[in-house]
Structure formats: structure tokens, C-alpha cells
Swiss-Prot record:
Renumbered ranges of Kelch repeats: 353-405, 406-455, 456-503, 504-550, 552-606
Role played: Substrate-specific adapter of a BCR (BTB-CUL3-RBX1) E3 ubiquitin ligase complex that acts as a key regulator of skeletal muscle development.
Gene field: klhl40
Species of origin: Xenopus laevis
PANTHER family: KELCH PROTEIN, KELCH-LIKE PROTEIN 40
Protein name: Kelch-like protein 40
Length: 614
């Protein structure tokens, strides 16, 4: 009777362990040694049977008619003895210490002697260590050692971060074939194909005479059909390396003809059958399949991965993050992370970096200031939130703004006994990942709103001394390190929505000294004047304003609504409104959206291929 699967596996594992322990014991006591590997003066006693069972290289050697198959002592060249010692230790114990310093050497020797288990361990180690500084080196290593699994992982990492990698000089040291392997990928995370052309020409310009010869082949991997005709005419054809090259101009003419509907005659294309390589990856072999018809590669018009970006309303709450596409009336899950604190503030920078600050964080290591606030950044690649250096002093009811490479956390109330109002401004330097202090506000304020425009940071309204709602508006110029007062708002308010829309700052609803309001004002930045705007249909506090693709949206907030007991109670609403420019009125487009409770709302560009449709 056959044993149950689990019991069978346990017995197998036990027998493997027993066998391996026995072999190691015999090695340690010099029993049945029939082989000695000699490397640079060092000797490694071992067993032929063990080497042959783990390595096709040694198996072939011992089974051949070569002189080495009969000798007890075998000299190995081009091998580091320390590395070989680690590999032999692994063969007998399944234990090996792989570090960033030795992984390449161990990888190369494991590849040389065809030891797949160590090969796989090294590949997994390198995949986990992939980063901006080493991804190209690992990509080239994968190609050098004929390891598709590693090369593809590294290439995908490069493609995901192509715009960042393009700033690295190492990209421009790739060979033509290596460059083609990257830029021919559908997974390239770029919004415009023009970026690929510019990278290729920058690469070619490094060694003009040598690399220009490779351009006709490389051009086949640039998807010129995705590039506007004006750009091809004014930038591509007039480039100094393209203009005198008749072969390149001929290829570009094919593209221009295709854009006008004149496709070339189809060519017969012979495809090769795929088989599995040693890593289980699909590799191409020499078997020819039947012929098929195909257009020239330069006419490839398949969109890249990064071209599926869409402008969306990003809703961030402590239960998850949801993206809403008003143009298609579709909702997507972006993240179900529970890291987001309640009562947070969110910010989208002009580079589409998304940040959240707020909540209460207790740092045991800081004795002077143990309380701080969370600071998180959204990772577009993994659709998750990354913990950043926490806000040094815990506070609430503050505002977030940005200028250049800095994020400003302005005013608010201390999250400690007394809840003191603050005029202090904290500055987060994005390149160094450090918090510091900036020039303080001219006054203490909380419940205000902050917007950013043209590298200036605007602070509007809020509550000041004696909890009075302020009309005051200030702007901060980081280059001059100064605050300046601007024309005051018509109505003092706090807990209101604000956004920059078509060159003006719009503020909507909120709390006044007499209660809730539905009034909206617009500030003309050029003239320093406020004007009234179409009122919102309902008095609310904490209404959010979002400007996206030339349209103004109003979302959520709190209104005073009569309940079943006919009592007026503050009620949170999760609806979305859009302003109709032609009819000059607000229109409701979504009555309620999930995960919007307690959320903040910002405009963000998100890749729909990374999102899950609700």
C-alpha cells in the first residue's frame, strides 16, 4: 500500500538528510576519499560519486576517456580556491553564505561546473538585491552567463524604472544588442516614445563613428508609429546622426507612409520554435517553423506599459486607496494597505509623487520627542505605501505644500497636552530624505488649507487666536526665504477645500464663525484679486476640491442633515460633483463611493494595468 504524500515526503527528506550527513562525516574523517581537487596550491579531498551526482561537468569528466577520469588528483584552473571551498561545503551540507561581495564569483563557478542548485540560489539572491545602482550590471551578468531568468528579471526592473535609469551613465555603456533587449520590451515604463528615441541618440553620440553603424538595427526597436509626425519631421529627421544617413531616412519614410495609410508589402517571416532553457525559461532554438507574413519591425505600434497612465481622483483612507476615473465612470483598487493613519493630509507633487502625513507615531528611541506623525509615500510600482522618515513633531490640522525638491508641513496644532497652535514650518528634503525647519509663518494657524503653484506655497484661511476664522492669505517664496501677505479672502473660513484650477486658486465651502457655508471664491494669481464663484449646492465642511484635465470636481465632506429622530447631526458624505462650465452649475456624478469615508482626495496619474477594477 502506498504511503500518504505527506508521510512519503517526510521519509524522503529524512533519508536525504541522513545520506548527506553520512557523506559529510566520511569527508571529515577522510573515509573513501578517491579524488583531490588541486587549486592554486590548495587541496580539497572529496568523493567522485558526490561530485558526479551534483555536477554534470564532473560526471562527464569521470565517465570520459580523458586522462583526468583516471587520476586521483585533478588540477582546476581559473577558479578561486576560497570560492570552490564554499561550493564543496554546500554540496556536502546544503549550507552556503552568499554575500554581495562573493555572489558573482560563486555564480560564475557554479555556472562553470553546472551546479544548478547553487546557480538558482545565486539567481534568487541577485533578484532580491536588484536596485537602481546594480540592475544594469546584473542584467549584463545574466546575459553573460546565459541565464534568461536573471536577465529577464533585471531587464524588467530596468524597464519599470527606465526614466530613472536613463540618467545613469551605465546605460550608455551597453552594447547594441543589450540596448535593443531593453528598448524592444513592451514593459518599458514610459509615457512617450520620444523618450526612447532620445536615449538611443544620446547612446549613439557617446561613440559616434562606431555606434552610428548600429542605428539601422536599433531603429527597428523604436516605435516611431507612436511618435507624432511633427516630432519626426522636426526632431528625428533633423538630428545630426540621422540627417546624413540614407538608410535611416529610408526607414523613417516607411513610417511616414504608414501614418498616411500606405503600408509596405508584407514580408515572409520564418519563426523559430521555443523550448525550455536550463532555468525553465523559454529560449529560441534552431528549429524552423512555417513561414508567416509580418510588417517591418519599425512599424510596431504596440503601446508600451507606461502609456496606460490615466488621470484619476485618488482617494486615500485608513482602509485602502481607491482610484476613480470620471471619464469612464470606473473605480479601481489601488491599495488595501492599512498603514494610512486617520486624520491625515495628502499631497501630489508636480512629478506625480504621492505623500501622506499625519496620525500619531511613538518612537521609543527618541527620548526628547517620542511622539511624531507618520509620513508615507505611495510606490507606484508595487501599489503600496512606503514608510518615510516620520514628521519630527506630532501635529494635526496642518497643511502640506511643495516647491522644487522640498515638501512643507505648515502650522497646525500640537498633538500633546495643551494642543498649542503652531506657526512653525517643517521642510522635508526629498533627495536627502531628511526633515528640517523652514521660515515660520507670520502667525499661528490651524484648520487652514495649503496649495502650491509655480514653486510658491500658498496658505489660506484657517483659525487663529480665539478660534476666529481667518480671511488671511500668505504666500511663501523658498528662493527668497520670505512670507508675503496677499489679498484676503472675502469670507473667513476653516476646514474648506482648495485647489489651483486654470491659473486661479479656488476655495469652497467650509466652517465660518457663524456655521457652515456653501460659498466659493476664486483668486486670480496675476491680479491678486478675489471674485465670487457659483455656490456649491449644499453647505459643507471638509469639502475637497480637485482640478483634473480642465475640470473642477468637488468631493465628500460633512453636512448637517436631519436624522430619523428629526435631529440635525453632522453626516459624512461620499459623493462626487463636477462643475459644468457651459451651464455654470454643479452636477452630481456619483452618489457614493466605497472606501471614501475619512479619505483625502488628490489628482494623480496612475497606470490602470497596475490597478484592480472594482
Amino acid at each position: 500500500m502506498a504511503l500518504p504524500t505527506q508521510q512519503s515526503e517526510e521519509l524522503r527528506l529524512y533519508q536525504q538528510t541522513l545520506l548527506q550527513d553520512g557523506l559529510k562525516d566520511m569527508l571529515d574523517h577522510n573515509n573513501f576519499i578517491d579524488c583531490v581537487l588541486k587549486i592554486q596550491g590548495k587541496e580539497f579531498p572529496c568523493h567522485r560519486l558526490v561530485l558526479a551526482s551534483c555536477s554534470p561537468y564532473f560526471r562527464a569528466m569521470f565517465l570520459s576517456d580523458l586522462e583526468e577520469s583516471k587520476k586521483k588528483e585533478i588540477d582546476l584552473e581559473d577558479v578561486d580556491p576560497d570560492v570552490m571551498g564554499k561550493i564543496l561545503h554546500y554540496i556536502y551540507t546544503s549550507e552556503i553564505e552568499i554575500t554581495e561581495k562573493n555572489v558573482q564569483d560563486i555564480f560564475s563557478v557554479a555556472n562553470m561546473f553546472q551546479i544548478p542548485s547553487i546557480f538558482t540560489v545565486c539567481v534568487s539572491f541577485l533578484q532580491k538585491k536588484l536596485c537602481l545602482s546594480n540592475c544594469l550590471a546584473i542584467f549584463r551578468l545574466g546575459l553573460l552567463l546565459d541565464c534568461p531568468r536573471l536577465a529577464v528579471s533585471a531587464r524588467d526592473f530596468v524597464c519599470d524604472r527606465f526614466n530613472l535609469i536613463a540618467r545613469d551613465s551605465e546605460l550608455y555603456e551597453l552594447s547594441p544588442d543589450e540596448l535593443i533587449a531593453v528598448i524592444s520590451s513592451d514593459s518599458l515604463n514610459i509615457e512617450k516614445e520620444e523618450d526612447v528615441f532620445e536615449v538611443v541618440m544620446k547612446w549613439a553620440s557617446k561613440e559616434k563613428e562606431k555606434r552610428t553603424k548600429a542605428l539601422p538595427v536599433i531603429f527597428e526597436s523604436i516605435r516611431f508609429c507612436l511618435i507624432p509626425q511633427d516630432y519626426i519631421k522636426n526632431k528625428v529627421e533633423k538630428h545630426e546622426l540621422v540627417k546624413p544617413n540614407k538608410e535611416l531616412l529610408k526607414k523613417l519614410q516607411i513610417v511616414k507612409d504608414a501614418q498616411q495609410g500606405k503600408l509596405p508589402s508584407l514580408k515572409k517571416k520564418t519563426s523559430a520554435k521555443a523550448s525550455e532553457g536550463k532555468d525553465g525559461e523559454q529560449v529560441v532554438n534552431g528549429e524552423l517553423d512555417e513561414e508567416e507574413e509580418a510588417l517591418p519591425g519599425i512599424l510596431n505600434d504596440t503601446l508600451r506599459f507606461g502609456m496606460f497612465l490615466k488621470d484619476m481622483i485618488f482617494m486615500i483612507s485608513d482602509t485602502g486607496a481607491v482610484a476613480y476615473d470620471p471619464s469612464a465612470n470606473e473605480c479601481f483598487f489601488a491599495s488595501l494597505s492599512a498603514q494610512i493613519p486617520k486624520n491625515h493630509v495628502s499631497l501630489a507633487t508636480k512629478e506625480n509623487q504621492l505623500f501622506v502625513a499625519g496620525g500619531l507615531y511613538y518612537n521609543e528611541e527618541s527620548k526628547e520627542e517620542p511622539l511624531s506623525s507618520y509620513f508615507l509615500q505611495f510606490d507606484h510600482l508595487d501599489s503600496d505605501w512606503l514608510g518615510m522618515p516620520p514628521v519630527p513633531s506630532a501635529r494635526c490640522l496642518f497643511g502640506l505644500g511643495e516647491s522644487e525638491n522640498s515638501i512643507y508641513l505648515i502650522g497646525g496644532k500640537e498633538l500633546k497636552e495643551g494642543e498649542q497652535m503652531l506657526d512653525s514650518v517643517l521642510c522635508y528634503d526629498r533627495p536627502s530624505f531628511k526633515w528640517g525647519e523652514s521660515d515660520p509663518l507670520p502667525y499661528k494657524v490651524y484648520g487652514h488649507t495649503v496649495v502650491s503653484h509655480d514653486n510658491l506655497v500658498y496658505v489660506l484661511g484657517g483659525k487663529g487666536n480665539e478660534k476666529k476664522c481667518l480671511k488671511r492669505v500668505c504666500v511663501y517664496n523658498p528662493k527668497k526665504f520670505e512670507w508675503k501677505d496677499l489679498a484676503p479672502m472675502k469670507t473667513g473660513r476653516s476646514l474648506f477645500g482648495a485647489t489651483v484650477h486654470k491659473g486661479k486658486i479656488f476655495i469652497a465651502a467650509g466652517v465660518t464663525d457663524t456655521g457652515l457655508t456653501n460659498t466659493i471664491e476664486a483668486y486670480d494669481i496675476k491680479t491678486n484679486k478675489w471674485e465670487d464663484f457659483t455656490e456649491f449646492p449644499q453647505e459643507r465642511s471638509s469639502l475637497s476640491l480637485v482640478s483634473m484635465n480642465g475640470t473642477l470636481y468637488a468631493i465628500g465632506g460633512f453636512a448637517t442633515i436631519e436624522n430619523e429622530s428629526e435631529e440635525l447631526v453632522p453626516t459624512e458624505l461620499n459623493d462626487i460633483w463636477r462643475f459644468n462650465e457651459e451651464e455654470k452649475k454643479w452636477e452630481g456624478i456619483l452618489r457614493e463611493i466605497r472606501y471614501a469615508s475619512g479619505a483625502t482626495f488628490i489628482a494623480a496619474r496612475l497606470n490602470i494595468l497596475r490597478l484592480t477594477k472594482m
